[in-house]
């Protein structure tokens, strides 16, 4: 291959006879010049892998939008999964095997408490004092909804004050770290060191790279791991974790929502409603136990599966719904992703949003906005009261649901409007919501069910779209998991829409499925053998200009040579299958041999057929930074070649690099947040 140069500074192309379309400097849109020398996309399990560190225990943190928790397993007893100690506090009718994802900071912005403790303390504060404290809840969604997420992204507390999101996520993770290490130390009878622990943090599969990186940065700040010891922390995708756990289910650990088969004493003659009742009873009974045994072989459910059978996991949580399609590979039970993860912001928060809209309709948007600012703790109380009634909604419910209005709501409304809450309800045209003399909103079951409808409709529509895909048309099972999967209204909607296409199964401990699966993933991260790339990724390069093929506006003449600018050099395509361990290699040459840093812009697109980085839908999404200090020998060679190796088959994009001349490792930073 002819000699190639690329680079920063003023070094221009000096090539006269390129032998490859890639043999060109990449100098586009401010990129430091780079030359891809040897494009390759290979699977090579023999490549050196970093030495595996051994850990005594795996601790998984399920960091949820509405509730969070942790579970752990000692690596010597992988079949025993221990779910964290019971939380103090809790609401009637709500499982307290997890704790609310709520955090309280003092007026000085120092961490005070997390979970039920934070909520209860905030509730007991005097209203004038509460305004000074920073209370945050349901903040995880900010990472999904913020298009330009950075390390400086802010969150807004209940009192309207801003606080750095990274600080809040780090505080929350540090809290779980301390709780888990304390519990492990108590169990072991001696202090447990953080270095003994492999940490796993769950995130939605539909999250983009910046959000995953943000979670990792927060974990580093919380002291779970460090950039130097990044392998100590694994990011797990929530529906994948659920899938890993579901494949180990025994018959008594699940409820089938269909009238086709007898499952665990539920006969075909029973109504679907009886199945829901039984599901709730299973969930209730299961809360009594904290240690779960999992099969170290594949569960009984797979005895019906054959090589190549497919199933869908629908992870419906507080903020998002995540859909994953997996195919089983026997006999080991390894999993292959068949279609890139899809989903959207269709979690149970949508029901809360509809309730808030209803309150705005009855009492006025201006009042609700002011009430949230002036009485933040009372607003939290009102939403807690709604949460417990929301969980009582069911398709066959006939009696109304009562939601207690805090006294300060009634009092503040009278001051704000000059008339009573009761008067507002009478005057509003909202049917099905009445005022009771005990100071409660009485909602008819239809009114409550209507609050669920937009969110459930979105989930069903998304599933319908998924079932249209050829890869998904022959699925055998649909597993419904996540906290929102406990809602009988969602269960019935899924059963009605898809019960004739596949068998719909809910694990008994549906709210803990992801948590337990995340522990299993931490014990064996290689269980998912093939994933699908959610996006097309690549870099911008210069290619030799070809008359008639390249647009005239892309022509660049440098030192008498004609180049086409902004060419998209594709690493991987959207929805492409990528095996674990599959590597994408590129070689780059710095413009000047003495150059110490190469910065390469990474671009992404949802489309597959990308020709130029200026095509519609192509966005700059990150940078690859090659630090060449220390990688060279004593004498700087006339020409250096740096080979980068990228992995797209894991839950995060990873990169390594080596200086070909010296065979020394090059420090690589792949950054989707600070570019």
Curated annotation (Swiss-Prot):
Database matches in InterPro entries: ATPase_NBD, HSPA12A_NBD
GO cellular component: cytoplasm; nucleus
GO terms (BP aspect): import into nucleus; inflammatory response; liver development; macrophage activation
Compartment list: Cytoplasm; Nucleus
Keywords: Acetylation, ATP-binding, Cytoplasm, Nucleotide-binding, Nucleus
Keyword Translocase: no
Region of interest (Disordered), residue spans: 1-45
Top-level division of the source organism's lineage: Eukaryota
CDD domains hit by this protein: ASKHA_NBD_HSP70_HSPA12A
Polar residues biased stretches: 17-26
Sequence positions bearing N-acetylalanine: 2
Tissue and organ expression note: Expressed most strongly in brain, kidney and heart with little or no expression in other tissues. In the brain, expressed in glial cells, including astrocytes (at protein level). In the aorta, preferentially expressed in lesions.
Assembly, per entry: Interacts with SORL1 (via cytosolic C-terminus); this interaction affects SORL1 internalization and subcellular localization.
Protein name as catalogued: Heat shock 70 kDa protein 12A
Organism name: Mus musculus
């Amino acid at each position: 291959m002819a000699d190639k140069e690329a680079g920063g500074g003023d070094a221009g192309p000096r090539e006269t006879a390129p032998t490859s379309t890639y043999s060109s400097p990449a100098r586009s849109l401010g990129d430091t010049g780079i030359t891809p020398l040897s494009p390759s996309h290979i699977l090579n399990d023999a490549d050196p892998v970093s030495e595996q560190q051994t850990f005594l225990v795996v601790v998984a943190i399920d960091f949820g939008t509405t509730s969070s928790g942790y579970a752990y397993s000692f690596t010597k007893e992988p079949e025993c999964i221990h779910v964290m100690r019971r939380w103090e506090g809790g609401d009637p009718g709500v499982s307290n095997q997890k704790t609310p994802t709520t955090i309280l900071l003092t007026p000085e912005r120092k961490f005070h408490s997390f979970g039920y403790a934070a909520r209860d303390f905030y509730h007991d504060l005097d209203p004038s004092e509460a305004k000074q404290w920073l209370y945050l809840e349901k903040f995880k969604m900010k990472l999904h909804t913020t298009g330009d997420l950075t390390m400086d992204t802010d969150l807004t507390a209940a009192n309207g004050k801003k606080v750095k999101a990274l600080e809040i996520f780090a505080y929350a993770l540090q809290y779980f770290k301390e709780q888990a290490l304390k519990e492990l130390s108590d169990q072991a009878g001696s202090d447990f060191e953080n270095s003994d622990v492999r940490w796993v943090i769950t995130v939605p599969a539909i999250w983009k790279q910046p959000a995953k990186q943000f979670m990792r940065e927060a974990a580093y700040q919380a002291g779970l791991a460090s950039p130097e010891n990044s392998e100590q922390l694994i990011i797990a995708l929530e529906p994948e974790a659920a899938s890993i756990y579901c494949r180990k289910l025994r018959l008594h650990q699940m409820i089938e929502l269909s009238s086709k088969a007898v499952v665990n004493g539920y006969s075909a003659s029973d109504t679907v409603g009886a199945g829901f009742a039984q599901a709730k009873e299973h969930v209730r009974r299961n809360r009594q136990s904290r240690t779960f045994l999992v099969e170290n072989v594949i569960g009984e459910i797979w005895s019906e599966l054959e090589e190549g059978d497919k199933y869908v996991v629908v992870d419906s949580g507080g903020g998002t719904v995540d859909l994953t399609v997996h195919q089983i590979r026997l006999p080991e039970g390894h999993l292959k992703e068949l279609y890139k993860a899809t989903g959207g912001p269709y979690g149970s928060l949508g029901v809360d949003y509809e309730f808030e809209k209803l309150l705005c309709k009855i009492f006025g948007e201006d009042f609700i906005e002011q009430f949230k600012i002036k009485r933040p703790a009372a607003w939290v109380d009102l939403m807690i009261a709604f949460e417990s009634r929301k969980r009582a909604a069911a398709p066959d419910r006939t009696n109304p649901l009562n939601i207690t209005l805090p006294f300060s709501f009634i009092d503040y409304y009278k001051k704000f409007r000059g008339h009573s809450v009761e008067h507002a309800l009478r005057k509003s045209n909202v049917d099905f919501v009445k005022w009771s003399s005990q100071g409660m909103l009485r909602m008819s079951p239809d009114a409550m069910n209507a609050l669920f409808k937009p969110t459930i409709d979105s989930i069903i529509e998304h599933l319908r779209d998924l079932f249209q895909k050829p890869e998904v048309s022959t699925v055998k099972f649909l597993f419904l998991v996540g906290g929102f999967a406990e809602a009988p209204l969602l269960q019935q909607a899924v059963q009605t829409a898809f019960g004739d296409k596949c068998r719909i199964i809910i694990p008994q401990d549906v709210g803990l499925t992801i948590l337990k699966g995340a522990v299993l993933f931490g014990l064996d991260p290689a269980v998912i053998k093939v994933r699908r790339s959610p996006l097309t990724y690549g870099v911008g390069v210069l290619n030799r200009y070809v008359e008639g093929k390249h647009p005239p506006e892309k022509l660049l003449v440098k030192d008498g040579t004609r180049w086409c600018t902004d060419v998209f050099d594709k690493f991987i395509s959207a929805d492409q299958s990528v095996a674990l361990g599959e590597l994408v290699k590129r070689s780059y040459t710095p413009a000047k041999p003495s150059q110490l840093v190469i910065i390469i812009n990474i671009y992404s697109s949802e489309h597959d057929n990308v020709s130029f980085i200026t095509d519609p839908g192509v966005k700059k999404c990150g940078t690859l930074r090659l630090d060449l200090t220390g990688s060279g020998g004593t004498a700087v060679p006339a020409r250096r070649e740096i080979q980068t190796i990228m992995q797209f088959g894991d839950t995060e994009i990873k990169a390594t690099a080596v200086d070909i001349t010296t065979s020394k490792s090059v420090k690589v930073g792949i950054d989707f947040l600070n570019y």
